[in-house]
């Protein structure tokens, strides 16, 4: 038909809906229920759209909203039976070109004001052709999805799932409920945000912590043996970024083979005693988990892949419809987002947009069939992100190996510049801090300051368990203000920070956290966090500006 869809979640606010509506002036609005209709009719329309409601309406409802042209989903099905045989409709559909706009996805992401990303049919079709490079799927297999149905990554998955005759299971972002769904359905593939995999790992370690001392020691021993076995296996198989020939390669291979032989008996025994039981958490059919971006802690990726739960990290943006790079099933390169997709050109450039002459860290630029048409009615913003050479500035700081394997380090706009001129990427520090069971979320701050500070949202359940373990009073979970003011809690968090952010873990002196403050209010999706559970840094820096100011007094 050539129509353009503009998907949005049911959690859309009236403010956001008005911005989008007044920009695109849609002729038809499809809503899930009457609650959403009641919100949308508050918008001051220039031209009233046709409303389609998924749920059925009774006669009383139709009279109540008689000022609007409203149809139900059932009405549309009846219309469709007639229209699909209409020769005029068939002719219109035949004239749709692959380069025509297919969708506008409005995204605020981590920055704030929504922008409309225009994607063509060709953009979306490129994602379909690229998907098979990640996993080899079969008809009837079950694909569990956690992201909202309108999200660009989810849409890419959905097109492929239906095209290949698979079954799509939509689950929830709540880990416990998701695990119940896994138990009931036994999916083959699971696509989820990093936070969910982190939560599963934390729950595993939480259960282990309840075991007797000997059982805990056995678990940690076999995990270390599995780590060693996995590292050696990847060295032997060449599953690491190619940064050029080194005389140490042959030595590494020999050491890898030796290490693999030594670790194999312990890994095999660990599988029988421990890991096979853990793997059952994800059902009997599990093949691979897919997660996106660079926000997955390396320790979590290593843990899962070492014990036999393969996680394949991928990378993309809504502006790239979304896929840019992906790891491949059975060929995962730990700590990276995999290889740049075929047909895509990637470059690492400096802050001025010049391509780096030597391999190093810089801003990732990409050019290919997946790059968006532009931002809807925003030529200025489009020109800022897509250059005259067709390359799109992802805004991500990355490294690119000789064989096109990409490693995402952080966001260009997130870079903190201390007053001594040192540049700090907050993401690796935050990811490391969140490895602590006591820390739910961490936000590193310190722009133009002498040192770094951090806003820490504690894991209050784990804090109370810690207090109990050291013989201290347990607080009412609802009395968060009292918990964050407790000196024992403050010392415990400080000890965790020092244990994680230090030279031994690869952090430089100026990257260490010298001051922190504890937050009592949990982060919310749509406020402090995006739908992908990434922190919305600009919102947090503004909302907690007084707390940040007090860190540097």
Stretch-by-stretch model annotation:
Residues 56-60, 220-234, 265-281, 286-309:
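Short gly/Ser/Thr-rich phosphate-binding loop of adenylate-forming enzymes
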Residues 107, 344, 352-359, 363-418:
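Conserved ATP-binding/catalytic segment of the ANL
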Residues 102-128:
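Conserved AMP-binding A3 loop
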Residues 70-71, 83-106, 113, 136-142:
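Conserved pre-ATP/AMP-binding loop-to-beta segment of ANL
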Residues 12, 19-22, 27-31, 368, ...:
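AMP-binding/adenylate-forming catalytic core of the ANL superfamily
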Residues 121, 296, 305-309, 317-335, ...:
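Active-site loops of AMP-binding adenylate-forming
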Residues 125-142, 149-250, 258-275:
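Conserved AMP-binding/adenylation subdomain of ANL enzymes
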Residues 4-79:
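Structural core segment of the AMP-binding/adenylate-forming
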């Amino acid at each position: 038909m050539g129509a353009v869809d503009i998907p949005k979640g049911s959690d859309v606010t009236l403010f956001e809906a008005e911005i989008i509506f007044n920009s695109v002036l849609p002729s038809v609005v499809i809503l899930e229920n009457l609650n959403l209709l009641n919100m949308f009719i508050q918008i001051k329309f220039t031209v009233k759209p046709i409303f389609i409601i998924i749920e059925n309406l009774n006669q009383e409802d139709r009279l109540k909203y008689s000022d609007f042209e409203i149809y139900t989903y059932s009405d549309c099905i009846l219309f469709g039976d007639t229209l699909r045989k209409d020769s005029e409709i068939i002719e219109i559909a035949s004239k749709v070109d692959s380069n025509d706009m297919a969708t506008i996805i409005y995204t605020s992401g981590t920055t704030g004001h929504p922008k409309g990303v225009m994607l063509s049919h060709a953009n979306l079709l490129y994602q379909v052709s690229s998907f098979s490079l990640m996993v080899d799927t079969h008809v009837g297999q079950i694909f569990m999805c956690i992201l909202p149905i309108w999200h660009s990554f989810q849409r890419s998955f959905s097109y492929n799932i239906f095209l290949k005759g698979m079954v799509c299971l939509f689950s929830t972002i709540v880990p416990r409920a998701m695990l119940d769904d896994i138990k009931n359905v036994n999916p083959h593939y699971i696509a989820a945000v990093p936070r969910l995999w982190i939560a599963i790992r934390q729950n595993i370690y939480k259960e282990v912590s309840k075991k007797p001392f000997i059982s805990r020691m056995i678990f940690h021993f076999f995990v270390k043996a599995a780590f060693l076995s996995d590292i050696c296996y990847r060295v032997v198989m060449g599953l690491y970024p190619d940064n050029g020939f080194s005389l140490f390669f042959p030595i590494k291979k020999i050491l890898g083979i030796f290490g693999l032989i030594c670790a194999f008996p312990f890994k095999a025994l660990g599988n029988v005693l421990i890991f096979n039981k853990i793997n059952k958490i994800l059902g009997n059919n599990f093949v691979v988990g897919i997660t996106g971006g660079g926000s997955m802690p390396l320790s979590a990726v290593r843990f899962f892949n070492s014990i036999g739960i393969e996680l394949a990290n991928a990378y993309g943006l809504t502006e790239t419809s979304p896929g840019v790079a992906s790891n491949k099933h059975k060929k995962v390169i730990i700590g990276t987002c995999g290889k740049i997709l075929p047909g895509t050109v990637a470059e690492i450039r400096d802050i001025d947009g010049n391509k780096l002459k030597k391999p190093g860290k810089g801003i990732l630029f990409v050019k290919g069939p997946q790059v968006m048409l532009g931002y809807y009615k925003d030529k200025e913003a489009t020109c800022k992100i897509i250059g005259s050479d067709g390359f799109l500035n992802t805004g991500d700081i990355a490294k690119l190996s000789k064989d096109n394997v990409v490693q995402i380090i952080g966001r260009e706009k997130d870079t903190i510049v201390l007053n001594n001129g040192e540049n700090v990427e907050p993401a690796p520090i935050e990811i490391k801090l969140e490895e602590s069971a006591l820390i739910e979320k961490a936000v590193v701050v310190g722009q133009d300051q002498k040192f770094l500070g951090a806003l820490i949202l504690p894991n209050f359940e784990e804090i109370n368990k810690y207090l109990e373990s050291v013989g201290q009073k347990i607080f009412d979970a609802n009395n968060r203000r009292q918990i964050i003011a407790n000196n024992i809690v403050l010392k415990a968090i400080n000890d965790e920070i020092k244990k994680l952010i230090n030279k031994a873990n690869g952090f430089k002196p100026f990257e260490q956290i010298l001051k922190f403050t504890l937050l009592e209010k949990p982060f919310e999706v749509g406020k402090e966090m995006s739908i992908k559970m990434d922190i919305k840094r600009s919102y947090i820096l503004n909302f907690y500006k007084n707390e940040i100011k007090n860190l540097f007094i």
